Amino acid sequence: MLTLENVSKTYKGGKKAVNNVNLKIAKGEFICFIGPSGCGKTTTMKMINRLIEPSAGKIFIDGENIMDQDPVELRRKIGYVIQQIGLFPHMTIQQNISLVPKLLKWPEQQRKERARELLKLVDMGPEYVDRYPHELSGGQQQRIGVLRALAAEPPLILMDEPFGALDPITRDSLQEEFKKLQKTLHKTIVFVTHDMDEAIKLADRIVILKAGEIVQVGTPDDILRNPADEFVEEFIGKERLIQSSSPDVERVDQIMNTQPVTITADKTLSEAIQLMRQERVDSLLVVNDERVLQGYVDVEIIDQCRKKANLVSEVLHEDIYTVLGGTLLRDTVRKILKRGVKYVPVVDEDRRLIGIVTRASLVDIVYDSLWGEEKQLAALS
């Protein structure tokens, strides 16, 4: 699908931003470029759509050299998403999404249908089509930025740190949505990030760059288990290598508790406290009759609100980290250890609760990792 052959970029004065990059990307593959500031990751990506012209080498998309194409026409065939989103404030959401199809002279009705179809993919209804960007939250605006890149059905999408400016919960939610979207649409994606956790979570393969050169290319598991050198090991961070000592435990389903303590939103706060006391827990997951996760309540929330509220529905918090069933365990480890989360609910694609991973669930894995390391050191000494 996409091939880079001996691609380099040299600026005036002889500074080499990218040096002799060679890479083949298959159709439908999700590739993350990552590395320290100034490593050439964004420059490499921008050479693909000729926002930056290569100084040397060749880039082929579906066997066609990009230098043989008109740069404007080339860019219209490639989706592009940036951190700043770049929505036009004077255009409606539908007009923003339909920008490239309009340039490609799609009929108006087809553009409208495409906008509604895409909004549905990210659970945004037709009521959004006539709104303006300032009426949307930051997360919703970034969703529209992604949909705009998908609107003309390009086979290739370039994404330059698209979620970098969002708060952690919104960022996490968008990553989950985008991962699900990619499974449905099978686009070829080149994604630039400075966040190793994001790369590990999203990518089929990760390309690590340093000083304009590729240091290592591999799947997240390959790189976690076999870092190419000390630079890669330090860049990954040892806290991300916890799972490598427990290769038999890979997915949340293997360690989650399938019977988390739950309550429905119509119950009283007194009933919630009684249930917590009975089950010896300090928080409850709130679900509806179909076990769709609504949010959570805990002792602290109830204590703060008990004088002015009576029902769980009045005090439940909806912002909660979740992972899909089948998610790689490393993503959940990251949420619990790095973000200080006490637990992570596991849901299906319809957000029905199927389990929970707690800090206690991870004790054996962390213990095996640390104990295995100590035994290795003892054997070497």
UniProtKB/Swiss-Prot annotation:
GO molecular function: ATP binding; ATP hydrolysis activity
Effect of Q259K: In strain: 168 / LH45
Keywords annotated in UniProt: Amino-acid transport, ATP-binding, CBS domain, Nucleotide-binding, Repeat, Transport
Impact reported for S313G: In strain: 168 / LH45
Gene: opuBA
Protein's UniProt name: Choline transport ATP-binding protein OpuBA
Impact when changing I320L: In strain: 168 / LH45
Entry function: Involved in a high affinity multicomponent binding-protein-dependent transport system for choline. Probably responsible for energy coupling to the transport system.
Recorded consequence of changing D68E: In strain: 168 / LH45
Gene Ontology CC annotations of this record: membrane
Organism lineage: Bacteria, Bacillati, Bacillota, Bacilli, Bacillales
Start and end residues of each ABC transporter domain: 2-236
